[in-house]
Amino acid sequence: MALLQIAEPGMSTAPHQHRLAVGIDLGTTNSLVATVRNSIPEVLTDEEGRALLPSVVHYMKNGHAQIGYKALAAQNTDPKNTIASVKRFMGRGLKDIAYVENLPYDFLDTPGMVQLKTVAGVKSPVEISAEILATLRQQAEDALGDELVGAVITVPAYFDDAQRQATKDAAKLAGLNVLRLLNEPTAAAIAYGLDNGSEGVFAVYDLGGGTFDVSILKLTKGVFEVLSTGGDSALGGDDFDHRLLCWIIEQAKLSPLSDEDLSVLMVKSREAKELLSTKAETHIDAALGSGEEVHLTVTAADFVKMTQHLVAKTITPTKKALRDADLTVDDVDGVVMVGGATRMPHIRKAVGEFFQATPLANIDPDKVVALGAAVQANLLAGNRAAGDDWLLLDVIPLSLGIETMGGLVEKVIPRNSTIPCARAQEFTTFKDGQTAMAIHIVQGERELVSDCRSLARFELRGIPPMAAGAARIRVTYQVDADGLLSVSARELRSGVEASISVKPSYGLADDQIAQMLQDSFKSADVDMALRALREEQVEAERIVLATQSALDADGALLTDDERNAVTSLLAAVQQSSKGDDHHAIKAAVEALAQGTEEFAARRMDRSVRTALSGKKLDEI
């Protein structure tokens, strides 16, 4: 084949083959990755069996970074270079960050987005988040044993365009193909809709480490409709930690604290908050670098009193979300609790009293968002098991493909694939020094482009010049739930990219689809014979070009008789290519390949000698 398909694990076009996709909850405090196996969503753990990855990155002098639990341990010893809750900084300027004066980091107020100075250099929130995402990607690939097609990444409903784009950029840096950004409350609703088969109006109360979101959703026969959203992008479990930290400083009458001591007390505050969810009181003991010591006892009642105003701050946007949906508390059938912060008993109590119902929390609030995202990722990747009827999905009526050399069609998404879905294949260049590739998107079941429907064309330019077959161009087809096809082409070495969107069903009536299918059935034998002929003709052209290029470059390596023999074989290939006997073409190509083996060996010897020329033995 002129355009060589490089097989990529997990991205087969075979409709029966499961494509590996994951859902990622990129959280403020912790992050998770989940997938769907045997139609059941499950969280993927690390090699030690831990589901949660602390969203913490520690930069070291050698330029390396520690992520997760190893980084968590450095918060006390190296707080300035240990970045936590980076989600709060995504897409934000310095003036947008709450409590910035209490954070131990060295911020740079740069245009667009704040940056942080570390011993490993200046880092953006995008780069820091990419470290976390890359760790989750590796964790998933280790658990699943193959590469991922892509990921659905969740974001707070209140994230603006800058924050959402920053999340996409971080995923790209981490080597992830983003199938979709999904609002966290919607992901939770998907998980509960699958697990419980619930229907009606539900409020999703999502209090994470750094953000609060509330969504009012209507669930009808597995279809999710978002009626309204609300929230606060600067309110979360971290604020409860901060309030307890302030209480410790006040009660212990501490002098101004160093960054290290501040970090120690922040960890103590978080530990105390978590313990007070199950205990009536807990002790806070800390020895500070300043020589001061802290010995305090805090009760659950104290904690409720000092944080009650924060709980009230979540109820206000909840009321507004109900008003926006033109609903009252009586219209709500249930409340879904999401986020680790919702484990605090006084939060569950306040939410239950407001909605006059016991909140739903039978799915782990730390995992529910990742599980819902995994379900969505599984669908977007084109996987659908028998009985998966929780969402009304359409199918692709005709295969979507790409033109390859010789006017042939390579099918990328087969007909009857459920949508939304995404598939990718890799292709390469046909000629030496080729710097551009024309992408022709076609629709139909026939083997030749001339017999299929042309949808769109675009070009990928800026491919670095290299030998034919050396470049790797990944072409990705993605069809969303509305049937919109987006095609992107990316040269993997340079990163140059081009894309286009098209509506494949536009202007195509049902009878036309039926006729195209009938034509493909009637012409199947003829089409396959033509395809075989074209493939051999393309291969013949490729080997002729390669041989002529080799003769031009290194013809001096051959004697006159040898050169005449190669020229004769070349002529035989060119002559057979004009006919319609693909067996004859194949035989001529094989004869040329065998007849130039010695020539190829001499060229290799010359290349090796040239490469080693002038070098000493110990340099090799």
From Swiss-Prot:
GO molecular function: ATP binding; ATP hydrolysis activity; ATP-dependent protein folding chaperone; unfolded protein binding
GO BP terms in the entry: iron-sulfur cluster assembly
Keywords: ATP-binding, Chaperone, Nucleotide-binding
Sequence similarity: Belongs to the heat shock protein 70 family.
HAMAP family documented for this protein: HscA
NCBIfam families, alphabetized: HscA (TIGR01991), PRK05183.1 (NF003520)
Protein purpose: Chaperone involved in the maturation of iron-sulfur cluster-containing proteins. Has a low intrinsic ATPase activity which is markedly stimulated by HscB.
Protein name as it appears in the record: Chaperone protein HscA homolog
Annotated source species: Janthinobacterium sp. (strain Marseille)
Gene that encodes the chain: hscA
